[in-house]
Amino acid sequence: MSENNLLDRLDGLESRFEEISTLITDPAVIADMKRFTKLSKEYRDLEKIHTAGRDYRNLLANIEEAKHTMAKESDEELREMAREMLAEANERLPILEEEIKMLLIPANPEDDKNAIVEIRGGTGGDEAALFAGDLYRMYVKYCESKGWQVEVTDLSEGATGGYKEIVFSVKGEGVYGILKYESGVHRVQRVPATETQGRIHTSAATVAVLPEAEEVDVEINPADIEMQTSRSGGAGGQNVNKVETKVQLTHKPTGMVVVCQQARSQIANRELAMQMLRSKLYDIELSKHNEAIAARRKTMVSTGDRSAKIRTYNYPQGRVTDHRINMTVYNLSAVMDGEVQPFIDALIIAENVERMKEAAL
């Protein structure tokens, strides 16, 4: 993108930034929570571009000033200062241009949301459940390293350990935009503890990452919800098996069912179940959008296809391979201890390359 084209794009967004700056102080807009929330998010995104654009224009002005000084000034000391200024500005300019191009990539409104993560043991029986437990611990350690809050909302334990299924929410800054890359089939190759012949078995677990929908994202008619309660089999202190704290919600129009039993009270479980239901309904629409994106792109990065095999964990070789970007590391133990950031960083870069092409940047 040429310098003039970049300035034209920045000018257009600057006008929008000024418009929103006025709108978010309008009492009528403030009274409309859905509109105000949307505009506030757009304002925060455009503020970053506004700041970078200001720096870019100042840098271009410094370059012109330095060139003018070198052409017109006879004082050698001033000319030397201008040469240094020009060299610094020319070094900074392409870096700032790339930063602006990244900011100009259309923002994904879901990326700032919290997330709901579902891990299910797939093929492999007991070994798959154990691997699902390993993945859960991996994500908990990763989330702890980021300062995020993890809360289990539902689980079903495996016969020999691990989980047939575990569902948990993750709250923090930019959670969904990072964890979304983990959606898909994770495959493990290792010798199970019960294997006497030393043969390597292959098992799998499926990870689904959903953006946590807010009430402004999805409107649910209370008449469409059927609630059933029962005694919880999960953590609940003295209340376990004495009061009906377990909640099952059925969304009648879609037949979707969610269960929550980890909280200590029926009210808390109902709130968590409603949150999960909103997110699942929101995810249906988001999946349609992602399918349209996937049809345009050749890459599998972040399309959210949960049937796609995305990563293999090979224990005998200490190897982890991400098949979407053909990236392999030989530090499996560190990865299982939560060091998944290198994969996520590489996936973000790969997706941004595709998005920059789409945005003609």
From Swiss-Prot:
| Residues spanning the membrane | none
Q: Which InterPro entries match?
A: PCRF (IPR005139), Pep_chain_release_fac_I (IPR000352), Pep_chain_release_fac_I_sf (IPR045853), Prokaryotic/Mito_RF (IPR050057), RF-1 (IPR004373)
Extract the signal peptide range.
Answer: none
Question: What happens to this protein after translation, modification-wise?
Answer: Methylated by PrmC. Methylation increases the termination efficiency of RF1.
Q: Is Cytoplasm one of the keywords UniProt gives this record?
A: yes
Q: Which domain of life is it from?
A: Bacteria
Query: What Pfam families does UniProt report for this protein, alphabetically?
Result: PCRF (PF03462), RF-1 (PF00472)
UniProt cross-references to SMART domains, sorted A to Z: PCRF
Per the record, the major location class is cytoplasm
Sorted alphabetically, the Gene Ontology cellular component annotations on this record are:
cytoplasm
- Keyword tags: Cytoplasm, Methylation, Protein biosynthesis
Q: Which residues carry this modification: N5-methylglutamine?
A: 238
Q: What is this protein's function per UniProt? A: Peptide chain release factor 1 directs the termination of translation in response to the peptide chain termination codons UAG and UAA.
What is the protein name for this chain? Answer: Peptide chain release factor 1
Which organism is this protein's natural source?
Porphyromonas gingivalis (strain ATCC BAA-308 / W83)
Q: Which gene encodes it?
A: prfA
